[in-house]
C-alpha cells in the first residue's frame, strides 16, 4: 500500500478538525437568533468545544497508546460525525452546547491519535517531516475554508448546514482510517489504566481551561471562576501525587526529562497564545472597524491560509537544510516581524492591501513554526508513548491559547471600545503589537529545542 493513502486520510482528519472549529464562528449570529440564545450565552457554542478539547487531550493521547491508535482514531472520527449530525438538528441552546462539548471530546481523541499515527507510520527524518508539513497545510486550509464555507452555507442554507457538512467528511475519515491504517499491536508489556490519574488530570485541566475561557467575560472575581480556580489547583496537585505513585501513570514522568519534548511544549504554548489569537483580532478589525460582512471576512482569510500552507512546506525544506531549532527560531522571528508590520497597518481607515505585507510575513513564520513544533515533539519519543507525547504538547497548545486570548482581549479592551462593542482600532493595534512581542519571546525558547542534523 502506498504511504500516500494514510497521509491523505490523516490530512483530511486535520482539515475536518480545523474546518469544524472555525466554521461555527460565522454562523453564531444566525444560531443565536434562531435558537433564542441570550447574548452572554452564545459564546458557549464555541467555548464548550474549547473546554472539553483542552481537558481531554491528555486522556486522548494515552488512549491512543493503550487502546490503539487506529481504534482511537476511528472512534473519534465517528463521534465527530454523529455529534455533527445531532448538532444540525438541535432546537434549543442547551442541546447545541452539549453537542459542541461532545465534539470537543471527539477532537481531544482525534488530534493526538492523528499525530501519533504520523509519528509511527512514517520514520523519523525526512519522511515524517514531509508528512507533518502536509498535515499542517491541511489544517491551514481547514481554518481558511471554515470561514469562507461557513459564510456561503449560512447565507444559502441556514446555520444547520455548517454542522451537516462535517458528517460525510468525518464518516469517510473513520471508514478510511479503519481500512488503511496498520492494525493496532498490543503493548509489549501489560499496562494498567491509570484511572485516578485520568479522572484528576482531566477534571483539573478542564476546570483550568473553563476558568480561562470564562474569566474574560464574567470577571476574575466571579464566583464560578474562583471556585474553578481552587478546584483546578487542588485536582492538579492531587494528579501530581497520583502520577508519582502510579506504576503506569497517565503521563510518564520521564517524558518531562526529555528535552525534545519539554522545549516544544513551551514554544507551543507561546505559539498558541500569539499566532492562534491573531485571527480573533483580525476578524474584529474586518467586521467592526472596516464593516466587512461574513462572506467578505471569509474571503479576507484566504490569503493568510494560503501563506500558512506555503510556510508549512517551506519549514519542512528548511529543517532539512539547517535543522529544526534554527528553522523554528527563524519562523518565530519572521512571525514577530510580520505581526509588528501588521499592527502598523491596523488603522481605522486602512485597506486590505496595506495589511498584506504583514499577513505574508506572519503566515510564512506561522506555517514554518507549526511544522517544526510537531517534528520536535515526536523526535526521540518511543512509539508506545507517541500518543501521550502529542497529548501533552497539544494540551500546551490549548492552555497557551486560552491564556493568551484572555490576556490580549483584556489588554485590547482596556485601550478603548468600538461603538459596535468590541475593542477600538487602537485597542486592536495594541493587541497585535503585544502578539509580536510574545512571538519574539519564542525565539530564545526555539533555540532550546533538541538539535537535529541539517540533513536528517
Describe the residue ranges of each PLM region:
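12-transmembrane solute porter fold
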Residues: 3-26, 39, 223-231, 235, ...
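Glycine/proline-centered helix-kink
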Residues: 112, 134, 139-151, 205, ...
Amino acid at each position: 500500500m502506498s504511504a500516500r493513502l494514510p497521509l491523505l486520510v490523516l490530512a483530511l482528519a486535520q482539515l475536518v478538525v480545523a474546518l469544524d472549529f472555525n466554521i461555527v464562528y460565522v454562523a453564531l449570529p444566525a444560531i443565536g437568533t434562531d435558537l433564542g440564545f441570550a447574548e452572554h450565552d452564545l459564546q458557549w457554542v464555541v467555548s464548550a468545544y474549547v473546554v472539553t478539547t483542552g481537558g481531554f487531550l491528555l486522556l486522548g493521547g494515552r488512549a491512543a497508546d493503550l487502546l490503539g491508535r487506529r481504534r482511537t482514531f476511528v472512534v473519534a472520527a465517528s463521534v465527530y460525525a454523529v455529534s455533527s449530525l445531532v448538532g444540525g438538528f438541535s432546537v434549543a441552546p442547551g442541546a447545541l452546547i452539549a453537542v459542541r462539548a461532545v465534539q470537543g471530546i471527539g477532537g481531544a481523541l482525534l488530534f493526538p491519535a492523528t499525530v501519533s499515527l504520523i509519528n509511527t507510520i512514517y520514520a523519523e527524518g525526512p519522511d515524517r517531516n514531509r508528512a507533518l508539513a502536509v498535515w499542517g497545510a491541511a489544517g491551514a486550509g481547514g481554518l481558511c475554508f471554515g470561514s469562507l464555507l461557513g459564510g456561503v452555507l449560512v447565507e444559502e442554507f441556514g446555520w444547520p448546514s455548517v454542522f451537516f457538512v462535517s458528517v460525510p467528511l468525518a464518516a469517510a475519515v473513520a471508514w478510511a482510517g479503519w481500512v488503511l491504517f496498520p492494525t493496532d499491536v498490543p503493548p509489549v508489556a501489560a499496562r494498567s489504566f491509570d484511572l485516578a490519574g485520568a479522572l484528576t488530570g482531566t477534571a483539573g485541566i478542564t476546570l483550568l481551561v473553563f476558568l480561562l475561557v470564562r474569566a474574560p467575560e464574567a470577571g476574575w472575581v466571579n464566583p464560578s471562576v474562583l471556585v474553578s480556580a481552587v478546584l483546578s489547583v487542588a485536582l492538579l496537585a492531587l494528579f501530581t501525587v497520583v502520577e508519582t505513585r502510579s506504576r503506569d501513570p497517565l503521563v510518564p514522568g520521564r517524558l518531562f526529562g526529555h528535552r525534545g519534548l519539554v522545549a516544544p511544549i513551551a514554544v507551543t504554548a507561546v505559539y498558541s497564545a500569539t499566532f492562534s489569537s491573531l485571527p480573533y483580532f483580525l476578524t474584529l478589525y474586518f467586521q467592526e472597524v472596516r464593516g466587512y460582512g461574513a462572506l467578505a471576512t471569509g474571503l479576507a482569510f484566504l490569503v493568510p491560509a494560503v501563506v500558512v500552507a506555503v510556510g508549512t512546506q517551506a519549514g519542512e525544506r528548511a529543517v532539512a537544510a539547517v535543522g529544526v531549532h534554527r528553522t523554528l527560531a527563524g519562523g518565530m522571528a519572521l512571525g514577530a516581524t510580520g505581526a509588528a508590520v501588521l499592527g502598523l497597518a491596523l488603522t481605522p481607515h486602512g485597506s486590505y492591501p496595506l495589511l498584506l505585507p504583514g499577513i505574508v510575513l506572519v503566515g510564512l513564520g506561522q506555517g514554518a513554526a507549526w511544522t517544526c513544533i510537531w517534528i520536535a515533539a515526536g523526535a526521540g519519543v518511543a512509539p508506545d508513548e507517541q500518543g501521550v507525547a502529542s497529548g501533552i504538547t497539544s494540551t500546551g497548545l490549548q492552555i497557551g491559547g486560552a491564556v493568551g486570548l484572555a490576556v490580549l482581549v483584556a489588554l485590547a479592551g482596556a485601550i478603548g471600545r468600538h461603538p459596535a462593542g468590541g475593542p477600538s482600532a487602537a485597542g486592536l493595534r495594541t493587541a497585535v503589537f503585544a502578539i509580536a512581542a510574545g512571538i519574539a519571546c519564542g525565539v530564545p525558547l526555539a533555540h532550546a529545542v533538541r538539535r537535529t542534523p541539517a540533513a536528517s
